[in-house]
Each structure stands twice: as structure tokens, then as C-alpha cells.
Design a protein with these regions (language model features):
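Glycine-rich/acidic phosphate-handling loop/turn and adjacent ATP-lid/helix
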Residues: 43-93, 117
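Short C-terminal beta-strand
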Residues: 110-120
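Helix-loop-beta hinge of the Bergerat
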Residues: 1-3
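Short beta-strand element(s) in the Bergerat
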Residues: 40-44, 112
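Generic beta-strand structural signal
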Residues: 37-39, 107
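Glycine-rich ATP-binding loops of the HATPase_c
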Residues: 101-106
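Conserved ATP-binding N-box helix of the HATPase_c
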Residues: 6-37, 89, 93-99
């Protein structure tokens, strides 16, 4: 079977890995992921809990996932470097923010919800 958009799948796989790791590092005990295949791309719905002491980390995560400017050339460069050993977790999350085509992050007192989209 021919894969039509393997890069979108690879990108979403990367997003899933990084988001899961980030949430568990913020004290999550349960993370739910729901992946939807849509005509325009792949949408990931995330729900999880976190420790209130880690709220600043999640606020930072929200900013990294929703950059003011998404530069396609920068995203492509980041994607090419994705296999390289980047400096720290923040670099990885900045990469995720650049490869996403849309992101929404909502923080509650101890819950976080995300809707992340990668176009085909």
C-alpha cells in the first residue's frame, strides 16, 4: 500500500513523543491521546493532568507550541535536524511548535487540553 503523506505521519509521531514526555515531566499521571485522520491532515487531541507547581512549565509549552510566526523554511530546517542531538528539551518543543500547522492549548487548574494539527 502506497503511503501518500509519510512526512505528515512522521511529524505527528514526533509530536506525540515530545508531548507525552513533556506532560509526564510536568507530573502527569494520565495522558489521553486521540489521533484523527482528516482530509487536510492529522489532528491530535490531548488531555492530561499536571501538578500545579508545574503550571509555569506548561505555560511555556503553550507558547512554544503556538509561535507567533511559523516559518516554513525554519520548520523544514528543524525537521532535517530532528534526528540530530539538539541542545535540550526546549529545543525539541520549539521544533514541535514549528512543525505544527495549528495548535491550541488550554490550561485548567490541574488539567491541560491540546488540539494539535499537522497538514498533509
Amino acid at each position: 500500500m502506497k503511503q501518500r503523506h509519510p512526512q505528515a505521519r512522521q511529524k505527528m509521531s514526533r509530536v506525540i513523543d515530545e508531548i507525552g514526555a513533556a506532560l509526564f515531566s510536568c507530573g502527569a499521571t494520565e495522558v489521553s491521546l486521540r489521533l484523527k485522520k482528516e482530509p487536510e491532515g492529522l489532528r491530535l487531541l490531548v488531555q492530561g493532568d499536571y501538578l500545579p507547581v508545574n503550571r509555569p512549565k506548561l505555560e511555556r509549552l503553550g507558547k512554544l507550541l503556538q509561535p507567533e510566526i511559523r516559518d516554513p523554511a525554519l520548520a523544514e530546517t528543524f525537521w532535517e535536524l530532528a534526528g540530530a542531538d539538539l541542545a535540550d528539551d526546549t529545543s525539541e518543543l520549539a521544533l514541535v511548535g514549528q512543525i505544527l500547522d495549528d495548535a491550541r492549548v488550554t490550561l485548567g487548574d490541574t488539567q491541560v487540553e491540546m488540539e494539535l494539527f499537522v497538514a498533509r
